């Protein structure tokens, strides 16, 4: 009986698209990597999505949920998939969405067909929940496995930066269009003074305690 009631409630939530106050706030999907964005007084939370029958990181798409009172949430469903990028082959991992000049930019890490390594793409939409499209037709950055976990910071002077990486920390200056960058990719030294000393046995290749983005 208990399982029947839970199934009915879960079906109701999926049909209605609304999620009431609860912890965890999302109970109808396996979600992870929440990335918040506030726009016009409403909070949007972008998540990754694990497939129900997976025992590993089987993540094919991204979802978004929103609220204006932190109690009642709206499920906007799947808004983007790695299949929307011709150059991507799998792994729709932790993403970030930002708004600028009336456009919404999703920075998304995936596994690239072109070099069989990690890469970060960007998708553009006219609303917080899309529809989004790939304006470049190629990765924004790609070099190694650790090109994951992107996040974007817009400074007070208007300059936008994208930070990413695990276990390395990198950043670039984004151009005004938010889909290209200027200058070189800069790697930030992962010193113990800045990021803490790793617990347990020392690891010269990964010395710091905190090594995973998003960083800001």
Annotate the PLM regions.
Residues 1-22:
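Bacterial Sec-dependent N-terminal signal peptides
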Residues 20-216:
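Carbohydrate-active catalytic/glycan-binding domains of CAZyme proteins
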């Amino acid at each position: 009986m208990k399982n029947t009631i839970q199934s009915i409630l879960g079906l109701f939530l999926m049909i209605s698209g609304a999620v009431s106050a609860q912890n965890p706030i999302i109970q109808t999907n396996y979600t992870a990597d929440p990335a918040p964005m506030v726009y016009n007084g409403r909070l949007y939370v972008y998540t990754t999505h694990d497939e129900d029958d997976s025992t590993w990181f089987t993540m094919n798409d991204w979802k978004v949920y929103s609220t204006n009172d932190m109690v009642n949430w709206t499920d906007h469903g799947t808004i983007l998939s790695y299949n929307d990028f011709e150059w991507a082959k799998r792994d729709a991992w932790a993403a970030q969405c930002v708004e600028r000049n009336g456009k919404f930019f999703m920075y998304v890490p995936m596994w690239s067909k072109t070099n069989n390594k990690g890469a970060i793409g960007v998708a553009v939409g006219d609303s917080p929940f899309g529809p989004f499209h790939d304006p470049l037709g190629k990765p924004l950055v790609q070099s190694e496995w650790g090109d994951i976990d992107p996040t974007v910071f817009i400074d007070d002077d208007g300059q936008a930066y994208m930070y990413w990486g695990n276990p390395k920390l990198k950043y670039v200056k984004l151009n005004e269009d938010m889909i290209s960058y200027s200058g070189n990719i800069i790697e930030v030294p992962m010193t113990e003074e800045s990021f803490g000393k790793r617990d347990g046995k020392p690891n010269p290749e990964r010395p710091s305690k905190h090594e995973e983005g998003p960083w800001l």
